[in-house]
Amino acid sequence: MKQVFKLLLACAVGVLPMSVGARDSEAVEVRKMIDKVNQHWQAENSPEVRSFWDNAVYHTGNMEAYFLTGNETYRTYSETWANYNQWKGAKSDNRAEWKYSYGESDEYVLFGDYQICFQTYTDLYNLAPDDKKIKRAREVMEYQMSTPQHDYWWWSDALYMAMPVMTKLYKVTHNAKYLDKLYEYLIYSDSIMFDKDENLYYRDAKYIYPKHKTVNGKKDFWARGDAWVLAGLAKVLKDLPVEYKHHQFFVDKFQNMAKAVAAIQQPEGYWTRSMMDPEFAPGPETSGTALFTYGFLWGINNGYLEKDIYMPVVQEDLYDVTAEIPLYNAF
């Protein structure tokens, strides 16, 4: 999974604000990094794999690489994957058996880990509109929105897996219900796993302090879990209309969370698995560090985070993450 997060990082670095000369030079290096990592990944991994999160997350990064580089082989790779999966997540057509607890079989249609694929399908639709590409995405999400339940996003990963699906489909359909349900579902998530004092998310309700503690008695915030959220908020803000009534809610959440994450960065530039207790699981949590970097860079580049404050954070963790790419560093 490390390649996924390096790709997200590389795409974010590719739009760093710099002087013209530095920007041109850096762009060449970033694209070299993207191509070496991504082309190696695609050469070693068939696109004909399931649409569950473990593969679908990669395609969110692959599409960002395509948008940045224009490399048609990247787009083709994701289209092959989408066609292999019939532009679906979980494939059950019997709504009576659709579930959203954890599961990997075809009845888990409403589970966010089987909805992240809709992000890539929507990206591909926007490049070449064809209703078949988002037919299933709309069927699933619009059925979900028609139900009275609002507890679909019960674990932090869902805020990357499913939350951006709502804004992407809103941009296609202009159906305001996507935004209102997005807000409603996030409010529920906040009610069960958000720590208002720390501005961070627990992995899920089982990890709430003080019911759950680290071995040293501290709050246990999982780096990749919070990184999913920060990156997910960045993706939502990218598509969320500024005139939307709850837009400032999302801005505040993104900014407050970025501040909280930056404050507990390790001196070496990374975040540990349990962010407030480095001794609980020492050493870098690379996937979380990469996704945090993506979120920080997106926020800087789009005016949501102050460059003077957050670029030093990025410069610290950038070295740590890029040093973890053995393929690139071998050249």
Regions found by a protein language model. Give the residues of each.
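Asp-box/WD-like beta-propeller blade repeats and closely related beta-sheet repeat scaffolds
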Residues: 130-166
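Helix-capping and short linker residues that terminate individual alpha-solenoid repeat units
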Residues: 42, 46, 70, 86-91, ...
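Extended ligand-binding clefts on enzyme/binding-domain cores
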Residues: 157, 167-275, 281-293, 305-331
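Amphipathic, well-ordered alpha-helical segments in soluble domains
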Residues: 54, 61, 81, 113-116, ...
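Bacterial Sec-dependent N-terminal signal peptides
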Residues: 1-25
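Positions within ordered alpha-helical repeat solenoids
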Residues: 64, 123, 143-146, 168, ...
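CBM-like carbohydrate-recognition segments
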Residues: 23-56, 64-112, 118-120, 124-127, ...
